[in-house]
A protein has these predicted regions:
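N-terminal targeting segments with Sec-dependent signals, encompassing both cleavable signal peptides
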Residues: 1-171
Length: 171
């Protein structure tokens, strides 16, 4: 009787409700210095993009976001973009490998960002034939930086052709 009836009598259900307010930008800056793990990925992103894109703070925040959210495709794509700006195509490729599912994401912005970043990494590695379809896909989705990367790809092809001609002349 104790195990069958009394546990039923002592059953209590709790329901707790609370509102979690967002930090203001100024509060986020302060919290980011001391306890960035208390901030959401979006709050950290807003802080990162408030710095110049060539600054150490900008890149540092994207590195930190990746440390805190290592399995998030957006964190990996953004970290890859930061690494590409610093010329580290190999590290960017590793981030993009973690976000590989994003290329088929229903979110067109995420898929085009992935395609552009992967194409840019391949471009930096002089793998032009592999880079082109990815950059075209991103450009067709409306990504302006992909169009600029395609222009760079064509310049690089021209440079490679000139270099090959010079090599043939000197032989």
């Amino acid at each position: 009787m104790l195990t069958d009836i009394f546990p039923q009598l002592r059953h209590v259900d709790y329901q707790v409700r609370y509102d979690l307010r967002d930090y203001t930008f100024e509060e986020s800056l302060s919290v980011a210095e001391h306890a960035p793990e208390k901030l959401s990925q979006m709050e950290l992103y807003r802080i990162a993009v408030s710095y110049a894109s060539d600054s150490a703070r900008y890149h540092g925040f994207f590195d930190r976001i990746l440390e805190l959210y290592p399995d998030d495709p957006a964190a990996n794509i953004n970290a890859a973009a930061s690494l590409l700006q610093r010329g580290d195509a190999a590290a960017a490729e590793r981030c993009l490998d973690h976000a590989a599912g994003a290329i088929a994401a229903p979110d067109a912005a995420m898929a085009s960002a992935f395609a552009n970043n992967r194409g840019a990494a391949l471009l930096l590695e002089n793998r032009l034939d592999e880079a082109e379809p990815l950059l075209r896909r991103a450009a067709d989705a409306g990504r302006a930086e992909a169009r600029r990367n395609l222009e760079e790809l064509e310049r690089k092809r021209g440079d490679n052709a000139r270099l090959e001609r010079y090599r043939n002349i000197s032989q």
